[in-house]
């Protein structure tokens, strides 16, 4: 079984549990060992909270400091001198004489800690509260409401961006259609110019052909007349 070790300054155990529950709604949080160190035993003057949890939950990294096994043991060794804790907790899932094993069900707000070392509890471990402070509950509800409002606002922004994106797509489609039509018009104009040029060439050729035919016809008539005159002239001299 893998564990995760958390450390948080200026926080109570209950606050840490509330934050973990808020990050893991509907999940069961198993705490294998916790050390809620308080100055002079007063609940309002908590110095730090040290937790050993199963690693199947999500951690709010912005508020907790994540420790490795050596860092956890180092901090625990510091507590050993101050609080007369004899044994360092092992990584096994079964609770030992120095471990406090408690389970926080997802359906309940609090749970009673189980421990076989009452002297350790009285000297180093703060009492686990049965009821969550109402102010903290209200604060969490306000945070949830704010998050929900932010989510709704972001969803509206996303919807607006999608609409804008669709409009841009429609604009692009329209522009593409316009470009296609312009290309077709240009091709048709080129065909028209080609036909006009061919027509002008044909007309010029036809005119030249008509001129040549007319000239040939005139020459033909001229030679016929000349031939007729010659024939008549020869017959006149013959008689």
UniProtKB/Swiss-Prot annotation:
Residues 107-127 have a biased composition (Low complexity). Residues 104-127 are annotated as: Disordered. It is found in: Membrane. GO terms for cellular component: membrane. It is a single-pass membrane protein. It comes from the Eukaryota. Residues 134-202 form a coiled coil. This is Putative uncharacterized transmembrane protein DDB_G0281105. The chain crosses the membrane at residues 211-231. Keywords: Coiled coil, Membrane, Transmembrane, Transmembrane helix. The keyword Transmembrane helix applies. It comes from Dictyostelium discoideum (Social amoeba). The lineage of its organism: Eukaryota, Amoebozoa, Evosea, Eumycetozoa, Dictyostelia.
């Amino acid at each position: 079984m893998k564990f995760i070790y958390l450390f948080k300054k200026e926080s109570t155990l209950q606050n840490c549990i509330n934050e973990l529950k808020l990050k893991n709604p509907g999940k069961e949080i198993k705490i294998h060992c916790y050390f809620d160190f308080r100055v002079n035993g007063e609940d309002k003057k908590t110095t730090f909270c040290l937790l050993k949890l199963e690693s199947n939950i999500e951690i709010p990294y912005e508020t907790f400091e994540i420790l490795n096994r050596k860092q956890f043991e180092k901090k625990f060794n510091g507590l050993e001198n101050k609080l007369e804790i004899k044994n360092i907790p092992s990584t096994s899932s079964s609770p030992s004489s120095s471990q406090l094993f408690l389970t926080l069900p997802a359906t309940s707000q609090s749970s009673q800690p189980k421990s076989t070392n009452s002297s350790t509890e009285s000297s180093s471990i703060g009492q686990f509260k049965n009821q969550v402070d109402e102010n903290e509950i209200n604060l969490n509800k306000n945070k949830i409401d704010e998050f929900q409002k932010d989510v709704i606002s972001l969803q509206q922004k996303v919807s607006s961006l999608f609409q804008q994106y669709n409009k841009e797509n429609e604009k692009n489609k329209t522009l593409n259609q316009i470009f296609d039509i312009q290309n077709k018009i240009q091709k048709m104009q080129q065909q028209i110019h080609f036909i006009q040029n061919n027509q002008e060439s044909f007309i010029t050729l036809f005119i030249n052909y008509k001129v040549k035919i007319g000239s040939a016809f005139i020459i033909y008539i001229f030679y016929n007349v000349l031939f007729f005159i010659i024939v008549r002239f020869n017959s006149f001299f013959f008689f």
